[in-house]
Each structure stands twice: as C-alpha cells, then as structure tokens.
C-alpha cells in the first residue's frame, strides 16, 4: 500500500456509493416492469456488499424495497442512508486493500476532510450504473477537495462493479464553482446535463442502442441490459427453507416467503379484498373504476396495467425471450416462465382451506374460491351479464365489439381467444391432442371430446 495512504483516514464502502436514484420525472417515465427491474438491481447490489462483509446495517431503501413500498414515497436523504451524506464522499480515491479475502477485493475509501459538511441530496446524473453518483448542490473549494484527476477503478471480484471517478470530475467541479451549465429544453422538461437530456430523449424516441448478444433484446440504458443478462444465467442463490424453491433475485425470494406466512396487510376499501403488496392493491383498484389507460397501437386493445400492455405487445412481435431449461419451451415474460416451471416440479403451494384443493398459482386459488362463494363481481356494462372472473368478462366483451385479435398465420382465420387459435392450428398439423380415456378416440377440439364423452354415459350429444 502506498506510504501516504497509511496516514489518511480509511472508511469502508457503503451502500450509498453503489445506489442509483431516479428523479421524480425519471421515475414516472418508467413502467411497472422497469420499476421492478430497479428494485432487483438495488437488492442485488446490497446483497453483493453484504456478501463481501462491507455492509452491516440495512439501509432504509432496502427495507423499503423489500416491503414493496415505492422509494419515492420516502424523503430523499432517507432513501440511501442515515445521516445524509456529506460532499467529502464524492471526492475520494478508491484503493484495493492489500489483503484479499476469499478472492474478493475489499474496498476502502480515502476521505478528504477539507471538503465541507453540507448535507446533500442525490441525483442520478449518469446513463449507467458504472458511473459514480452526483449531488445537486455544490459550494466553493474544489481545489482543496480534488487533489488528483487520475481515474481510479474499483472492481469487485465475480460481481464486477466499476466506478470511474474522472468521468464525473467536470460535473463535480461545475457544482463547486456554481457555474450553471447549458439547460436543455425538451417539451415541458428541462435538463441541466446533456447526458440526462440524452437519456430522456431515448425514452421519447424509442431508441434502444444496448442490445443483448444472447437473445437480441434491446434497451435504452446499459444498466437495464446488465440486469437483463442475469435472466440468461442459471444462478439462483436464494433458497426458501420452507419448500426448497430457489430464486435469482432477493426481491423474488422475499415475495415468495409471504406465500407461506399468508400475510396480506393491504386491504381494498371498496370490496375488502386483501393483498400482500401495495402495488397489487393499486392495480386491483382499477377493476372498480374500469379504467384502461394503456392502449396498444397495433390493435387498439386497452389495458389497466402497463406491464400487461408490454406482455401483449409480444403477441404482435412474436418475441419469446424466456426459455424453460427443462423442455425448451419459450415464453413472452419471465413471470409466465416461472409459472410454467411449476409443471415440471409439480409444486402446488396454494391450498384452498375450504376443500383442500391445491394450485400452482395464487391467482388460480383466488378464482377457485369464488366457486364456494358464488360471487360474480365482474359485470358487463353493455348487457348486464355477470362473471366470476375478469377474464370471462373480457372475452365476453368481444361478442359486443366483434374483436378477433388472434389470427392464424396459415389461413388468416381469426379468433376471439388465444386458446381457440391454438386448437384451430391443429387442423393444419393434423394433431389430435384430446383423447377419450374410454375408447381411445382422439379429437382436435376439447369441445368435441366433451360431446363424445356423453355417448359413454348414455347421454345424447348436444347439437
């Protein structure tokens, strides 16, 4: 270790040094899937620091994310750490400690004490998580604070996190000298930094320059690409002690644990239904208002949730980036893949207290429970017909609109539901997947099989 470094005060790397914060405007530009992505990245970063023995106490942001609370509901300075960070943390060199434990580099920070004591707020001023974070308000004294322009890099063993100090020195200097940079105006939004402006423009233009070499999926931020790449790895370090299920993300693991505890603290004032998470309750409330603000430009179909719209769009593109390791079947979303994987494991963690029947999905259990209550909460505004499930109402509405969004590529015939299209396709392939257990006769359609079964029980088939 260099001689002068020994005389300087040392301090361990903290979570705030690897945390990413969005402004209120940037946060509102993200859909639910992207917000969940942010949550996973933050929880992964925290896990890495805990693994290295760098973090002892849990930051408020992590507690917030684990409980499903949106981070912007907290005060700015409370999100990353308590007490608020002082400017000296932005004027530091990073040096690897000489002793290496378990092949990981433990990082220590050199802190410059001359930099002042102002409490500062965070602002994400970079395009990627690989750049260091910047603060908003500065003060004079840069020459006392920054003693070198040399670029220092910190690398964390297996999980590589790189921070470039030099890349942000000019921005940091601007804040100390109080020189105002050129303001970029785009519609009704203003930006102090060209990089923030550039990132925002990518959202507006739809530009996605960061492409995954594995599956071809593109992103408008390199950090989103980095997080996406995890979906292609098979590593699942989080294991549930209750049922043995493993997870890639700590957030997914935390979510899963609530299945066993049965905790549902978020209750709908309208109908009394309880939920595990606040964002699930928010989504549920739209059922009562009937609002569907998210519209598909391809077919004009509307949705009450942005994530549902994102999944729907893949019907038009045919994109299926999530593949099952067991059977090779591909899916349009990771959540559908997770549900599919339960077919191979046979896991059915959701059990009905009324009759004991078990299900692979919580939504299936919820739908099943309505059988016992006889409740039909979903009512058609056109004709008044009521349905047990929202999916039933959604399909029924198409009888009024005449909409048939599912089209056969082979012959052009269109259908109101994807299941009808799937069954239709068997007429082209000659496949007859529905087989009678009594006599072995096979059918293209499940409805034809049901009609046939009546022959064996002595009923006349319906015409």
Curated annotation (Swiss-Prot):
A Pfam cross-reference name: KRAB
Zinc finger (C2H2-type): 154-176, 210-232, 238-260, 266-288, 294-316, 322-344, 350-372, 378-400, 406-428, 434-456
Localisation per UniProt entry: Nucleus
UniProt domain KRAB: residue ranges: 13-84
Keywords: DNA-binding, Metal-binding, Nucleus, Repeat, Transcription, Transcription regulation, Zinc, Zinc-finger
InterPro entries according to UniProt: KRAB, KRAB_dom_sf, Znf_C2H2_sf, Znf_C2H2_type
Function: May be involved in transcriptional regulation.
Assigned protein family: Belongs to the krueppel C2H2-type zinc-finger protein family.
PANTHER family: C2H2-TYPE DOMAIN-CONTAINING PROTEIN-RELATED, KRUEPPEL-LIKE TRANSCRIPTION FACTOR
Stated name of the protein: Zinc finger protein 486
């Amino acid at each position: 270790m260099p001689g002068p470094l020994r005389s300087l005060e040392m301090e361990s790397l903290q979570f705030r040094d690897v945390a990413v914060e969005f402004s209120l405007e940037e946060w509102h530009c993200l859909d639910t899937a992207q917000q969940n992505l942010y949550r996973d990245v933050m929880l992964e970063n925290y896990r890495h620091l805990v693994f290295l023995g760098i973090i002892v106490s849990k930051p408020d942001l992590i507690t917030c994310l684990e409980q499903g609370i949106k981070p912007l509901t907290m005060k700015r300075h409370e999100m990353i750490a308590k007490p608020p960070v002082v400017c000296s943390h932005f004027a530091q060199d990073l040096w690897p400690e000489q002793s290496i434990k378990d092949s990981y580099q433990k990082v220590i920070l050199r802190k410059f004490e001359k930099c002042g004591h102002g409490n500062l707020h965070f602002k994400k001023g970079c395009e990627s998580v690989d750049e260091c974070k910047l603060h908003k308000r500065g003060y004079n004294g840069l020459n006392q604070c920054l003693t070198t322009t040399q670029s220092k890099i910190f690398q964390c063993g297996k999980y590589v996190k790189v921070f470039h100090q030099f890349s942000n020195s000019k921005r940091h200097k601007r804040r100390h000298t109080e020189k105002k940079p050129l303001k970029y105006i785009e519609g009704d939004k203003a930006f102090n930094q060209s990089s923030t402006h550039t990132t925002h423009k990518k959202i507006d233009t739809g530009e996605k320059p960061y492409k995954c070499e594995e599956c071809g999926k593109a992103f408008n931020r390199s950090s989103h690409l980095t997080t996406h790449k995890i979906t292609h790895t098979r590593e699942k370090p989080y294991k549930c002690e209750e049922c043995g299920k493993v997870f890639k993300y700590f957030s997914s693991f935390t979510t899963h644990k609530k299945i066993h505890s049965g905790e549902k603290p978020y209750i709908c004032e309208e109908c009394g239904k309880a939920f595990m998470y606040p964002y699930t309750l928010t989504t549920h409330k739209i059922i009562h208002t009937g609002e569907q603000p998210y519209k598909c430009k391809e077919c004009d179909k509307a949705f009450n949730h942005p994530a549902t719209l994102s999944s729907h769009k893949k019907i038009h593109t045919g994109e299926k980036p999530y593949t099952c390791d067991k059977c090779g079947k591909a899916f349009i979303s990771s959540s559908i893949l997770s549900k599919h994987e339960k077919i191979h494991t046979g896991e059915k963690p959701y059990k009905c207290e009324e009759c004991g029947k078990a299900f692979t999905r919580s939504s299936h259990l919820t739908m099943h429970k309505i059988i016992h209550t006889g409740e039909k909460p979903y009512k058609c505004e056109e004709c008044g017909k009521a349905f047990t499930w929202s999916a039933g109402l959604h399909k029924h509405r198409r009888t009024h609109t005449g909409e048939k969004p599912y089209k056969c590529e082979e012959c052009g015939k269109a259908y109101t539901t994807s299941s009808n299209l799937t069954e239709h396709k068997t007429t082209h392939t000659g496949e007859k997947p529905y087989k009678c257990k009594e006599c072995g006769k096979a059918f293209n359609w499940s409805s034809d099989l049901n009609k046939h079964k009546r022959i064996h029980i002595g009923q006349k088939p319906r015409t």
